[in-house]
Amino acid sequence: MAINPLKILFVASEVEGLVKTGGLADVARALPLYLAQKGHDVRIILPFYKTIKRRDEARLIASRWLPTHPGLPDIGYRIYQMELEGVCVYLLDCPQYFDRPQLYAENNQAYGDNGERFAFFSAAALHACEQLDFAPEIVHCNDWHTGLLPLLLKTRHAHNPFFQHTRSVISIHNAAFQGVFGREQFWAMPEIADYEQRISYDYGHVNLLKCGVLYADKINAVSPNYASELLTHLGAHGMANIFQQRAADLRGILNGCDYKDWDPAFDDFLPATYDVDNLAGKRVCKQTLQQEAGLPVTDLPIYGMVCRLTEQKGVHLLLPVLDKFLHHKVQVVIVGSGDPSLAAQLQATAQRYPDKLAFLNTYDDRLAHLVEAGADFFLMPSLFEPCGLNQMYSLAYGTLPLVRAVGGLKDTVVDWDAEPEHATGFCFNDPTANILLDAMRRSLLYYLQDPERFAQVQRNAMNTRFNWPDSVTQYEQMYQDALARQ
């Protein structure tokens, strides 16, 4: 059912193509683009960081002062405008907050004023709408960085005719990061004092994600299974009671995959392309991966992994059993950076097995694409994974994902044994090293003993699609439900 075009303000702390640290940026680029293709007037707004790409394309359109509190100084900022694939992007420039080397942290140390920085961003995003005469029907917030916007719409702007028809939604990309800050950072926000009891994390601290969840008109998690997990104490990172309060307004919408960037038939990063009907190029990619990783060029199965080196990604589950697994006739290629301790352990293991394990303590797009194309299996033993994108890429590239059945991984990967006709990979449940090892050995056994079945599962994987237009239809319904709230 077609719906009338809406005015949508998409508020995010990062957008792929301009600035990115994680999966939020991918969604913040793709979702507005596909909404715009459906005829909606979508405008993205984000901070004008020092690290923004294509800065020279941004043009100054306004200079304004954000009112704060009687007796306290207003905050000056400038509004820049550019386009990203035809979608209007506003960049809020305030050097005291955003003229820094990184987005959120330096040397693994978060900026001490992140609460103040993103409180300003939230307030300025709404202020900028008025200055630009853009009255959105939907303000789409994302994660803790924008958690104050729903509260501001219901307090500061509750009787503002400009926002009379505006409703807010918030997408939860990762509830582990909640934006908890001392209340002194919100000196420009009198609303915080009035509502502190509801949105406080502990005495004297404000939880911005909690704020967004409590005051948004509708809430979505980035996969159906993750939405269910947020209602449990095990999956909600201390916020289960808050999500339970809003359960009627919470839904799960699976992220789409942007196949124009992730299609092995048209991937400029690859030494050879391929598709489901002709996998010759995949064999070339495998040989190139082995060469670039410094491994012998053989027919051994390759297990790939591309991730941030964090506990969330399950690296600590893999490390205790990596030695045992490398005693089999396999190769493993791990690409990623992050926790120095995890990196050191991986490096030490690679030195013990130079012909079997390659650890590349880095990240770049070309290498990520090569691992997806050249590996036979892709490891994602995550402790939690709200949606996950790499498993979608792996499926498209005929690289069978081996995942822990959590969050979006459970929604997107069909286990070899659980549903033989529709299998696309391998799943395991318990977050223990030995259970992971069992799953890896199971995948290896099937690879060696049943190549015909492996080829069929590979075809199933490559024919699986998670298209953004399907997700957009669900977002449109959520927007309509939000607008129906009184």
Swiss-Prot record:
This is Glycogen synthase. Pathway: Glycan biosynthesis; glycogen biosynthesis. GO terms for molecular function: alpha-1,4-glucan glucosyltransferase (ADP-glucose donor) activity; alpha-1,4-glucan glucosyltransferase (UDP-glucose donor) activity. GO terms for cellular component: cytosol. It comes from the Bacteria. One of its GO terms (biological process) is glycogen biosynthetic process. ADP-alpha-D-glucose binds at K20. Belongs to the glycosyltransferase 1 family. Bacterial/plant glycogen synthase subfamily. SUPFAM superfamilies: UDP-Glycosyltransferase/glycogen phosphorylase. Pfam families: Glyco_transf_5, Glycos_transf_1. The keyword Transferase applies. NCBIfam families: glgA (TIGR02095), PRK00654.2-2 (NF001903). It catalyses: [(1->4)-alpha-D-glucosyl](n) + ADP-alpha-D-glucose = [(1->4)-alpha-D-glucosyl](n+1) + ADP + H(+). Its EC number is 2.4.1.21. It is an enzyme of class 2 (transferase). Synthesizes alpha-1,4-glucan chains using ADP-glucose. Keywords: Glycogen biosynthesis, Glycosyltransferase, Transferase.
